[in-house]
Amino acid sequence: MRKETLLVICFLTLVLGTVAVIWSYALPAFKPLNLGHAKSAVVSVGAARQERALNPGELASLNQWIETHRRGWGPLAKTAPSSGDAVVSVVTDQGASYRLILFTGLSGADWDNTVIVQAGPDAPFRVHDFKSSVFAPLRQIAEQGTYQRSAPP
């Protein structure tokens, strides 16, 4: 085998090996979220984190929203400005739990209409920002309860 051929083979092996390693880490981020059907949910809203259970209509709306928005979630690459304006804690039919952290624009305008999902206690955070019309069902769930809003900074 000639020296040039060996160098080309080594170079291709190095490049393809690097690509394979990168894709093995990146591929799980492209899988759609499979959160499961929500059996019950509690929303914590406002600075005081006042809790209330979701009624059956809100639960149906949440399940429909989750089912239609399984794709497009990416890893959380930067620190969120706060712990969210509302947190929806969900228990599925299988007994698993996950959290939806909603940013409605109160704690950071650039995080408006953003949702962070944590599919379990040790699961990584996944984030997605939405258009106002797509985020509207979640905003309605978050803002339906009465709570005292904190003063702007």
Q: What are the functions of these language-model segments?
A:
Residues 2-153:
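Function-determining sites in protein domains
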